[in-house]
Amino acid sequence: MKNIIDYKDYFIRATEYAAVACAQLRGCEDNNKADQAAVNAMRTTLMNAPIDARVAIGEGEIDEAPMLYIGEKLGTHIDREDVLPIDIAVDPLECTKNCANDDPNAMTVMALSPKGDLFRAPDTYMNKLVTSRLFKDVVSLDFSMECALSRSYSVKPMASSNFKGS
């Protein structure tokens, strides 16, 4: 059986395709249209991948938005013994309103774990913090943005030539 990291390219591709699909609708002023484009792109990509994935945490029930639904199975290798079963937490388009209004900070969100390892939370909105392992003990959702950035910079300074601010 493979390790979860062996499947990463399929999930990266799914988030990229979802991001591109909704980015093409930035400024369309229709939240559901942008969200549906991201959902369709992500679902199609994952349904055609040689994976055994299940949505453990999804988004959509709260606000009746288009969604990958909890319990939905994705992939061409469902229930195969030679494939690692994977649970996903997913929101194909986080901040749909921002995308529809051509505002910043919309993103595609996905987390992976071996089957059964994701905490099953009730439908609720959550804060998200995305870092590499390098920052695991450095930043926290309990910190202000300024504090988190300052602490991150103390671990790994960012070269000014790498910064592409707006």
Protein language model features and the residues they cover:
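A short, surface-exposed helix-loop junction/capping segment
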Residues: A19-N31, K156-K164
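Residue-level detector of alpha-helix boundaries and kinks
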Residues: Y7, G27-N31, R80
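N-terminal hydrophobic or amphipathic helices/low-complexity stretches enriched
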Residues: M1-A18
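Alpha/propeptide regions of enzymes that mature by internal proteolysis
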Residues: R13, C22-N32, A38, M42, ...
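Acidic beta-strand-loop-alpha-helix segment within the catalytic core
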Residues: V109-S166
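A short glycine/serine-rich beta->alpha loop
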Residues: I5-K8, K97, K136-D137
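Flexible, acidic active-site loops/lids enriched in D/E/S/T/G that coordinate Mg2+ and/or position polar
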Residues: D35-F119
